[in-house]
Amino acid sequence: MKTTINNKLGVITVALLLSGLVPSTMMAQDKVEASVGADLVSGYIWRGQNLGGVSVQPSLGISYKGLSLGAWGSVGFESTDTKEFDLTLGYSIGGFSVSVTDYWFNTQVETGIDDDGETIFATNKYFKYGAHSTAHVFEAQIGYDFGPLAVNWYTNFAGADGVKENGKRAYSSYLALSAPFKLGGLDWTVDLGMVPWETTFYNGYTCLLYTSPSPRDTR
């Protein structure tokens, strides 16, 4: 699950609502809320990057008094599609939110240059946590939802972050703006994203702009 972190592009062909098998929201006496679900999407675009075609994206979450813990994954039907598994710990109050996400991708990421000038790549093994070899990316988020506009800032602070042209860690960051609106009797959102400085984590882009109008789930 990527909070505002995963923008899906394309028509959602099927929504696998598991509420018929497992209640989508379970309320205990201590007010703990849990949710489970899955989507089948025709294409997976994340922050302007094409990570695959038709994909299954399950999610699981639990929250209590603004504190939340969630798991989200994506598996494509093609062997070349990116596989992903994320864990997010977050806190929100009013419109304010902060979170830390552990992303894991099965693709290798350029993480630096060694003393011989050779490029260093991260491994794609899940349980590998070496400082310069892990496939995990750790990201911090801070944001505020003003109602007509939500603003979120994300920065990678550890793990398989991208690098700048000089081979130094980029602390890759992303600014996301999201605005809801109504059209044709449906609720929609328009998302605008920007990469503020160069980084191989976003394919070397600087100031990448990405927009994605999409239906908004109001369940």
Could you say what each language-model-derived stretch is?
Residues 81-172:
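Outer-membrane pore/translocation modules
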Residues 46-54, 74-84, 132-134, 156-172, ...:
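Solvent-exposed loop/turn segments connecting transmembrane beta-strands
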Residues 40-44, 64-66, 73-77, 93-95, ...:
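Transmembrane beta-strands of outer-membrane beta-barrel pores
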